[in-house]
Regions:
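Acidic, low-complexity intrinsically disordered regions
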Residues: 1-188
Length: 188
């Protein structure tokens, strides 16, 4: 039934990174099956609490003791509606403290903002790199500092020198988000 609907066809610009580092842009036609919209609240504290319970219980299983630690990806507009900043920082710290013998849980935040005028950021290295927007900076503070063994991969993705990075992006491109998720979820 959905396929038979008369849906609009959109011209979408795609960005793809080639193995040699060049970026290829192309335009493809895509049907818009469902029109995205935002409505309602963002119960981020409740989502983080559920994530905490899941990683805590998973890490408590003896067979998982030496496994690669869990990775939590939070995709959000950044505006938690069910707690204040201190409450979000507290539950995020609890998530980041749970782990295995291979390391602690990585909490990675993907902040999608309606303000497209700001420069996109992937694996932020400081709060100052982000727009002067409290939700972006809060998500930076609650994101995990990435383990040093990822620094070279992150620096290659960002096109910069290795430094300290956080698992946080702000309005990043689809290509960069996929790169972020690949880096954050691959055991090294």
């Amino acid at each position: 039934e959905l396929y038979e609907r008369d849906t609009p066809r959109l011209q979408i610009q795609r960005e793809r990174k080639l193995p040699d580092g060049r970026t290829l842009f192309s335009v493809v036609e895509q049907r818009e099956w469902i029109t995205p919209f935002a409505q309602g609240q963002t119960p981020m504290h409740a989502a983080f609490l559920k994530a905490y319970e899941l990683v805590r219980d998973w890490c408590a299983i003896r067979a998982h003791g030496a496994c690669y630690p869990p990775v939590v990806f939070n995709i959000t507009d950044g505006e938690a509606s069910d707690c204040d900043e201190a409450g979000l920082e507290e539950i995020a710290a609890r998530i980041r403290q749970v782990g295995t013998s291979d390391g602690n849980t990585l909490l990675m935040n993907i902040h999608i903002s309606s303000d497209l005028s700001k420069v996109p950021v992937v694996f932020a290295s400081s709060e100052e790199e982000l727009p002067d927007q409290r939700y972006a900076r809060l998500l930076y503070r609650v994101s995990s500092e990435m383990p040093p063994l990822y620094n070279e991969s992150i620096a290659a993705l960002r096109g910069c020198q290795p430094e300290i990075f956080r698992g946080m992006s702000y309005n990043a491109s689809m290509t960069d988000l996929i790169g972020m998720m690949n880096i954050g979820s691959v055991s090294v």
